[in-house]
Amino acid sequence: MNDLLTIGDKTFRSRLFTGTGKFPNASVMQKALIESGSELSTMALKRVEVNNPEDNILKPIVDAGINLLPNTSGAKNAREAIFAAQLAREALGTNWLKLEIHPDPKYLMPDPIETLTAAEELVKQGFIVLPYCHADPVLCKRLEEVGCAAVMPLGAPIGSNKGIVSRDFLEIIIDQARVPVVVDAGIGAPSHAALAMELGADAVLVNTAIAAARNPIAMATAFKLAVQSGRLAYENGLASVNTQAVASSPLTAFLD
């Protein structure tokens, strides 16, 4: 498919973005990321030795030719997130950033106020900001207005594998957005990813469902195909939903 996605200064063929946590080892992670076809992978700055080119998270991604998307997971407020972003840009040479601010370690819900504050400042500092946020149409619009390159509303809580529980709100966000919408968090099965794409999301980000699978490499293939299938379905028009039966072969003038 010649269906490209542009975010900021990069263009992607794959609409499956990936995470790097929870894999059994670096080798499996690299093979799964390559098999997924993903061209953008995120890693928590707190887990990476940014000054070590042999780091077992960073090196496999770089060697595979996948674009880096450092994230600020662990930041509890805007100040901490901005500081982490500046360190990442200096160490990794990228101004791309997945902005994550979740002060509650139990539920990892993103803080909307701190996220918006940090996003506005980081955009001013020249970052390409992709904020992880609630599936809140008003917040997503505000993040777009302050200059975020995309928005990343959650499908369900991080790591829950519950799927697209925020569907109604995601549909509004997708309808209103003038920047790409990347559904992030909660996607636990290829069918969830396909549904997000069928709704019109521009991309999805998947981590736990691939990394924690019995065979992460095979599961990466499943997600790759699901994202492609969902996007193809959206692009070509899904049949409308009806409240009553509609015959596929009407018996018009039968036996007249």
From Swiss-Prot:
InterPro entries assigned to the protein according to its UniProt record, in alphabetical order: Aldolase_TIM (IPR013785), Thiazole_synthase_ThiG (IPR033983), ThiG (IPR008867)
GO cellular component entries: cytoplasm
GO terms (BP aspect): thiamine diphosphate biosynthetic process
Compartments reported by the entry: Cytoplasm
Main location (coarse class): cytoplasm
Keyword Cytoplasm: yes
Highest rank taxon of the organism: Bacteria
Protein keywords: Cytoplasm, Schiff base, Thiamine biosynthesis, Transferase
The enzyme's E.C. designation: 2.8.1.10
EC primary class: transferase
Function: Catalyzes the rearrangement of 1-deoxy-D-xylulose 5-phosphate (DXP) to produce the thiazole phosphate moiety of thiamine. Sulfur is provided by the thiocarboxylate moiety of the carrier protein ThiS. In vitro, sulfur can be provided by H(2)S.
Quaternary structure and interacting proteins, as annotated: Homotetramer. Forms heterodimers with either ThiH or ThiS.
Family: Belongs to the ThiG family.
Protein name: Thiazole synthase
Organism phylogeny: Bacteria, Pseudomonadati, Pseudomonadota, Gammaproteobacteria, Vibrionales
Gene that produces this protein: thiG
